[in-house]
Structure formats: C-alpha cells, structure tokens
C-alpha cells in the first residue's frame, strides 16, 4: 500500500508546505482498551465462493459465501471475522455428509468477530460453511465503499473496496488475517450498464433480469483476504499487452485518455520485475483502477491483479499535471507492482512483519524509477527517504521495524515512516553491503521458496546469506530491524600517511530528545572515501580504525547508503564546508541533512546549515536547491508568531533563493532537464510561502489574466501558482477560488481547488475553510484533507476545531485513521498548551495501546518548542553576523 498522510498528496502539492475548542477535562474517562484480534487456530479456510449484490443507492449489499474449511481439531465453535453484518442463515456441511444443526450465532462488535456455536463438537475434517448475510456500503475508504463525484454528465457514484489491513471482514465473513491464505471465486450481480472489476478476468456473464447481470470472475490464486478487490461503476478500460499479461488502466468514463503514461509505465515495470524477481507475474491480467477522491490513510493499494489508486496518483490531466505528477505516477506504479511479488505472492505472516511488504516495495520503487528513468535523477531521493525515517526514529516514541502488533488499531498505525522509509533504507544499506547481484539472487531464492506462502523476516535474511556467503547479513539486519533508533558515527581523527588516510571512528546513538540515553549498539556497514580515491569499508561495532586510499578530505557514509548519522569534528566540518562543491551531489545532500539534524539536536552549531547554503552555487544540482529551499522553509516555521525576527530571516532566505530562481525562470526552456521543471515549482512555492513580493505579485498577475490569456497559467505551473495565490489570498480572492471549485466538473481539478481554500495565511479565511469542510459541498473525501491542510499553517486552530466538532469530523475520516488523524493536526504547533490538549484527547478517545501517534505528536511539539527556544538564537546570531 502506498501510504498517505493527513493531508493528501494533492493538498501538499498545492500548499507547498510540510505536513504536519477542545477543553481539557479533569480526569476524563479512559478510552476502552482493545483486545487482541488474532483468531483461534482450530479452523483453516481453503476456498471462498462469494456472491454479492450491491445496492449502491441504499448503501447496502446482500452477500452469500460458502467457505471450504479444514477443521484441524474437534471444536464446539467456529470463530471468524465479521463487522457491520447481519446473518440470515449459517450452515456447516461436511464435504461428505449432511448439514449439521444450525449453530447459535454470536456477534462480538468490539473484537470484530462472529462465533458459530454448535450443539455438538465439530469433528476434524473438511466442511463447507455457508453464510447468507447483509452488509453496509461505507462512504470512507474501508470495506466496500461508495465514492460520489461530478462529471459533465452530472453526479455519479462508484463502488470500490479497500481491505488492508483488516477490513475484508466488512465485505465477507472471513478469516481476515494474512496467514489464512485461500482461493476466491467472486460472483457479482450488478447493473448491466456498469463495469465490474476484480482481481481476476471475467469468466462469464449471465443475464439476471431487471437490467442486471451476474458477473463470474475466474478463480484467484491462493492469497490473503486483504488483497481481494471489487469495483463497480461507469468505467472505461485502456489496455495493452506486456508479454503474456494484459495490463489495464480503469478510469471513470471519459478519462481513459489521461491513462496513457500509466499504461506505458506498467508495461516497462512489469518487464523489469519479471526479470529481477526471476518468477514471472502469475496472473493473466494486471489492472490499475483510478478512483476520484482521496483518503487520509493511503493513495494506492496492491490488490493482486487489481491495484487501486486515486486519480491524482495515476492519471495525467494535460490541463493541470506537472513533471512531479508524472514522476509520482511512475513511482506509485513501481511501488504497487513490486507488491505483486513482495506482499501478494509472498506475504508476511502477521502485521509485525509488515515492513517485509512495505519497506521492500518502497526500495524497489526507488531502484526501478532510478533505473528506468535516469533522466529524472531520482537516485538522490534516497537521502530524503532516509531523513523521513530518521525524523521519526530519533524520538522516544519510535519503534523497531519488526514490531509487536496485537490489535487492529496497532496494525493500522504500523503503516508509518519506520515501516516504509526505515525499511527501505535498511534494505538499501544491506544491498550495498552484500552487492547488488548477491542481493538480487537472495531475493529470487526467497520468492521461489515461499511463493503463495507466508514468511517472517528471517526467511529473507536466510536466503540473502545463502547468496552472499561469509556476510553476517542476519546479524546486521537484526540490529537494524529488531531494535529502534539511529547509530551515530563520530569521526574522531583524520591523519594522512604514505598515501592513505587513517580515520578513527566511534559509534554511539543519535536522538533528538534524550541526550542522556544509554546508547544501543549496532554492527554498522561503513563506507568512507576521499574526494578522488577508492572507497574503504568496515563493519563498525563500537570503535574502528579505517584506512582510506588517498590523502584528501574524507567523507564517511560516502554514497549515503548507510542508515546512520555522521558527526565530524569542528575542523573536519570546516574542511567539508570549504570543499562542499567538490562533493558528489548525493554526499552534499547527506552532509546537509546530517548537519541539519545534528544542529537542531545541539550536537553541532545550528547555523552550520546556513554556512552550507551559502557555500552552494546557483549551478548546483536542482535537488540540492530543493533541499535548501525545504530547510529554509522549515526554519521559517519556527519564527511563527514573531513577525520581526521572521521578517529578518525571510529577507535572507528570499535573497538566497532569488538568484537560483532567476536562473530557472518562470518559463520552461526547450530541452531543459526534468529536475529543473520540478525545481521551478518548488522555488515558486517556497518563495511564495516566504512572501517574496515579486513572486506573489507575478502569481496574482497570472491568476487575474488566466481567463483571457490561458498561456499565463500553463499546466506545469497552474497548481503552484494557484497555491501562492491561495496562501496570500484576501477575502475576494478566496471567494473567487471558491466559485471556481463549485463550478468545476472534473473531479481531479475540483479536488485541487477545494484544497487551495485551506492554505491561506489569513486566519479568518482559514476559519472559513474549516467551516466549509463540515458541509457536504467539498465531498467527504476532501473535507478531512481540508482540515489537515489548515493545520499546516494554523495547527492550534485546526486541532481545536476538529475536536470541538468531533462527531461531524469522524464521519469524514477513515475509521482506520481516527487515532492518528486528530493528534497529528497539532504536531506542527509551537504552543505549549497543545501538549496537554493532545494528552487529554488521547486519554478520552484513544485506547492506551493505540496512543503512539498521540505520544509522537506530543514529542514533536516538545521538540519544536525546544528548537525555537534553544537553537533559533544561533540562527539569529548568524543572520546578524552576515548582515541579514
């Protein structure tokens, strides 16, 4: 699954900002504790025969399922997962024999189970469990859900499913755990004018009368329940052949012309993966289904043979799409298609090893994008992925990559930066350690050995070690996946003799909120090299001395494949600063990010990051300037509420970025590299957010001219320019944007316009956006994102509003996301009062076992306050020293 954050990818791109009244009550009642969700091990399903008849307008469906089961030991009852279902009949029949007496049906809503208790114990053997039931169609993206949207033909409704992690039980009474793999035969009785889609191709259609048809899909391979998919609506399907596999993109009717790049990309990626994994994709077809709308929780889902996405992550509308959108489409496909092997063909045994799915798919996404589109220069993005992980891993509420999971909510919260980004970074480090060929061979062995089965992490390590004899892969992997945290390698001394540089290294642990913590220990694969020499490698555990060929400046973690911080001494850092332009771009990024993190933690001067920004020429790689723009934007956020100091900082930041933007310009140049196109939008967004008068003025000029002169708002700039306008909007401009949103008929563009309404600096306009989010006008999938976007600039306002209107907001948030949604609204706050507010909310509404997100929000607020109070004075002093 491609995770999403509180603010959808659309909102983030529009806002150009990083993500991220409740009254504290005395002694609020504690939220109910959740029990473990794992089922008894007495029965195992082998096949589901499922028949559904959806009633889209009534938001309900009728279901009938016959499950072939093996009773593994005598039992008086059978327990499976079910939620929001009403059973009309339940029958258990031996494969050879007569049906048993009807069981007593007991529903446990809290534990999301149904238990069928029989008059006599059920003997071991094979049975068929037949159940007739009715279920609910939701309006948020879990279970079987409806999405309403507008197009040129009026209002439409489509149905889709989203089952990961634990929502197949809303569609089928089932053993809804990843280890219970079975085959599925799905039959759907649907309107004859609509298209039904599932994991497998349609095998047969039968007229069911009254304008209905029954669609029988071919039987699936053995798979986990969360990978089943069903979709229904007025769809188009564009197809192509990739070898023997039919690939398709399914869209709302009339939008398939926007699917060309996704379809072409699917063909390329499938060929690459068939080769890399050494096991051909086993299904006859592979669809990408693009739906209008968004979710707070995810942007795409790897259902086997029927990948679900939202339109913003799959389609390219020529009137609004950018180069970043194009790269995003490819990345989403590369991620979800990697899951067809890592996750679908081979699946983790339980959610504690979720990272086996997500970390690997994220790594494969980055690797494949860099290989198949080298012109995008995305290899540098690996440093940003590592930073996303370390930002989460450096605080007390972090957790190991392999983590304890007991409840549905804990499983939902496992989809985080540790699972995805740290998992990806650890894989990248291990591949670099054993070599790319040995790693690939180990992966092939793993896929072959465990196809159609379930695994734990050690199954992967075992196969990689077999492909890389003599390498302690399991030892290293255990250090980085079974314990939390970040190693820090201190460069104690550097001396050159006889053409070699001797580097003394000491390992400790990096944290940003526990300076006195006793450090953990890791076996860290370290790569060091001089500017022009060959790399030297060592496995560092405690202290190490490394001889590096050449006598020159030494970079530790050269190539940035290691998951650790590097802390240089003052003289060493000074040498790096003066030779900064000679470093490889990926090492420039790595040094910058280490400098930022170490400076904010008080381990080196916080102003060192500004020295690096000053040392960077305007001709540096676009990704370097994207990073600098991000750092400057982050520093600006710490001045929130202190106008005088903020204006001093903004003067410097704008002056630093303006020469780069002058070189890039407003207009694209023929033949310019793709990374420059991305940088242009980043600079416009950042300068607009910083209040650069020239950029704000030009953005407003283009906005006012767009109706008469379409060239004033080219597709490549439209979203970014409108974002600058919206951030700096007055009431009249906000009203105009609102009218545009109301009149727009294209769902993707409409969603973008509603997102724009939520990013204004003006508090009165932010309040109007919050009020609008509670109405039905934006649509349920946009409303929660609008509140989240307001939180990017006004976290206290957004949190207080959401909690004060919790009953209404709950209806607009995925049920799997609520424990994360509310606390994260506050995470960018600098107000100490928010700490107690978040704690009070968690005490009242969130089970103690599910409060990691709330605790993390509190930790982030505390960290931000500490940075503002203890680090920003050094930034002020640097600005004064340099005449800003």
Residue ranges and their predicted role:
Residues 1-24:
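Gram-negative bacterial Sec-dependent N-terminal signal peptides
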Residues 66-85, 185-191, 504-506, 510-527:
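Surface-exposed beta-strand/loop patches in extracellular or lumenal glycoproteins
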Residues 88-93, 473-474, 484-557:
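Beta-strand-rich binding/interaction modules
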Residues 386-387, 499, 515-516, 529-538, ...:
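Long, ordered, helix-rich scaffold segments
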């Amino acid at each position: 699954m491609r995770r999403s954050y509180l603010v959808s990818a659309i909102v983030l791109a529009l806002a150009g900002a990083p993500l991220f009244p409740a009254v504290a009550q005395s002694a609020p009642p504690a939220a109910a504790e959740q029990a473990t969700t794992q089922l008894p091990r007495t029965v195992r399903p082998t096949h589901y025969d499922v028949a559904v008849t959806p009633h889209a307008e009534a938001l309900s469906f009728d279901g009938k399922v016959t499950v072939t089961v093996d009773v593994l030991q005598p039992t008086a009852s059978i327990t499976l997962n079910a939620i929001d279902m009403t059973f009309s009949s339940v029958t258990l029949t031996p494969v050879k024999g007569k049906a048993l007496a009807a069981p007593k049906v007991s529903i446990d809503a809290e534990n999301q189970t149904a238990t069928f208790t029989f008059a006599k114990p059920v003997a071991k053997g094979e049975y068929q469990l037949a159940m007739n039931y009715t279920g609910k169609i939701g309006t948020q993206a879990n279970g079987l859900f409806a999405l309403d949207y507008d197009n040129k033909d009026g209002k439409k409704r489509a149905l889709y499913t989203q089952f990961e992690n634990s929502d197949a039980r809303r569609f089928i009474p089932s053993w809804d755990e990843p280890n219970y793999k079975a085959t599925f035969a799905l039959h759907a009785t649907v309107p004859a004018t609509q298209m039904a889609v599932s994991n497998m191709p349609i095998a047969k259609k039968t007229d069911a009368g009254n304008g209905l048809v029954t669609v029988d899909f071919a039987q699936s391979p053995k798979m986990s329940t969360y990978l089943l998919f069903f979709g229904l609506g007025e769809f188009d399907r564009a197809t192509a052949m990739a070898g023997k596999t039919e690939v398709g993109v399914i869209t709302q009717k009339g939008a398939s012309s926007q699917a060309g790049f996704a379809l072409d990309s699917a063909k390329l990626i499938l060929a690459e993966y068939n080769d890399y994994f050494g096991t051909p994709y086993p299904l006859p077809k592979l669809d990408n289904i693009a739906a209008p709308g968004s979710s707070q929780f995810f942007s795409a889902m790897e259902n086997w043979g029927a990948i679900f996405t939202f339109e913003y992550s799959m389609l390219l509308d020529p009137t609004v799409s950018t180069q970043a959108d194009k790269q995003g489409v490819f990345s989403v496909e590369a991620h979800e298609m990697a899951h067809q092997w890592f996750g679908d063909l081979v699946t983790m045994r339980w959610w504690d090893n979720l990272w086996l799915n997500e970390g690997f798919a994220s790594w494969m996404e980055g690797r494949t994008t860099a290989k198949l589109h080298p012109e995008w220069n995305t290899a540098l993005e690996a440093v940003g992925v590592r930073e996303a992980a370390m930002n989460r891993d450096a605080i007390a509420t972090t957790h190991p990559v392999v983590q304890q999971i007991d409840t549905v909510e804990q499983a939902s919260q496992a989809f985080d930066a540790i699972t995805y980004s740290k998992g990806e970074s650890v894989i990248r480090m291990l591949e670099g350690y054993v070599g790319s060929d040995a790693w690939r061979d180990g992966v092939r062995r793993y896929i072959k050995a465990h196809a159609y089965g379930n695994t734990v992490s050690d199954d992967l390590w075992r196969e990689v070690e077999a492909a890389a004899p003599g390498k302690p892969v399991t030892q290293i992997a255990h250090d980085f996946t079974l314990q939390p945290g970040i190693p820090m390698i201190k460069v104690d001394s550097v001396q050159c003799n006889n053409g070699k540089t001797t580097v003394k290294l000491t390992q400790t642990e990096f944290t940003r909120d526990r300076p006195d913590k006793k450090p953990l220990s890791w076996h860290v694969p370290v790569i060091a090299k001089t500017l022009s020499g060959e790399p030297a490698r060592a496995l560092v555990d405690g202290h190490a001395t490394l001889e590096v060929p050449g006598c020159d400046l030494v970079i530790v973690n050269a190539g940035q494949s290691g998951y650790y911080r590097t802390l240089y001494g003052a003289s060493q850092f000074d040498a790096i600063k003066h030779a900064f332009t000679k470093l490889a771009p990926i090492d420039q990024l790595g040094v910058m990010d280490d400098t930022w993190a170490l400076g904010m933690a008080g381990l080196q001067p916080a102003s060192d990051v500004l020295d690096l920004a000053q040392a960077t020429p305007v001709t540096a790689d676009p990704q370097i300037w994207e990073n600098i723009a991000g750092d400057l934007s982050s520093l600006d956020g710490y001045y929130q509420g202190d106008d005088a100091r903020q204006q001093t900082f903004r003067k410097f930041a704008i002056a630093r970025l303006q020469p780069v933007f002058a070189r890039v310009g407003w207009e694209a140049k023929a033949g310019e590299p793709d990374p420059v196109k991305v940088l242009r939008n980043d600079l416009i967004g950042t300068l607009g957010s910083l209040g650069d008068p020239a950029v704000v003025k030009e953005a407003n000029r283009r906005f006012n001219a767009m109706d008469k002169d379409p060239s004033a708002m080219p597709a490549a700039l439209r979203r970014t320019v409108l974002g600058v306008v919206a951030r700096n909007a007055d009431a009249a401009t906000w009203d105009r944007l609102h009218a545009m949103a109301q009149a727009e008929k294209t769902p993707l563009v409409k969603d973008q316009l509603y997102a724009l309404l939520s990013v204004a600096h003006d508090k009165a306009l932010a309040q109007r956006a919050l009020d609008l989010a509670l109405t039905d006008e934006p649509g349920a999938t946009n409303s929660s994102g609008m509140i989240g976007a307001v939180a990017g600039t006004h976290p206290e306002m957004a949190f207080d509003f959401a909690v004060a209107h919790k009953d209404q907001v709950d209806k607009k948030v995925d049920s799997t996301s609520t424990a994360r949604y509310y606390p994260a609204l506050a995470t960018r706050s600098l107000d100490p009062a928010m700490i107690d507010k978040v704690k009070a909310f968690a005490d009242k509404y969130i089970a103690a076992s599910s409060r990691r997100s709330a605790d993390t929000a509190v930790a982030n607020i505390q960290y931000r306050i500490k940075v503002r109070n203890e680090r920003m004075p050094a930034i002020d002093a640097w600005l004064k020293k340099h005449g800003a």
